[in-house]
Amino acid sequence: MHWAPERDWGREAVLKTYDREPRKTETAPFTEEDRRTVMENLEQNVLATARANPQVTFYYFIPPYSISWWDSELMAKGEFERQMEGYRLMARMLLECKNIRLFAFDDQFDITCNLDHYMDVIHYSEDTGDQLLEWMAAGEHMLTDDTVDFYFDRITDFYANYDYDSIYE
């Protein structure tokens, strides 16, 4: 089921939403300025609220962006390493707050690599959203201090080595 039935869904619909650009040869580093920006934004917009409300449990999640997003937004633009370092920093900071629960789904490769779940590079189907909520309710795919590095190592390896040309075959 799709939350936007008037829209086209699936591989062909996703591929129509962007023109694939050649990959940049240089990759953008995660700079100290990037680090400060992430830290300041998280502190101001998330962590301060969580700390001020210790009686509330906050739920956040990293959505399962499609393989086409990884290709068009990170790989082609040379932003992959920078994004992964930013994600890691964000996750570690969020996990410092004991009243924050962080879930992550970019390791659900059966979702991210199946463009039938998407209408563009980021918007997934209602069924996918329902599945994410079921997992969250069951406490599945929650990052912890013990799992965060394994999670990011796993997705970094997968997306860094994916055959992105196969999307277009």
Question: What residue spans do the PLM features occupy?
Answer:
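Substrate-gating cap/lid alpha-helix
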Residues: 68-103
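Alpha-helix N-cap and loop-to-helix initiation/capping positions
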Residues: 34-37, 77-82, 124
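Secreted/periplasmic serine-hydrolase-like ester/acetyl group-modifying domain
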Residues: 1-55, 151-169
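Histidine-centered active-site loop/cap adjacent to the catalytic His
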Residues: 117-162
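Extracytoplasmic/secreted proteins, especially bacterial periplasmic and envelope-associated proteins
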Residues: 41, 85, 89, 127-132
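Active-site segments of SGNH/GDSL-like serine hydrolases
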Residues: 50-76, 104-106
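A cross-kingdom marker for long, charged
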Residues: 53, 103, 129-133
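Acidic carboxylate-rich catalytic motifs and surrounding loops in phosphoryl-/glycosyl-chemistry enzymes
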Residues: 100-112
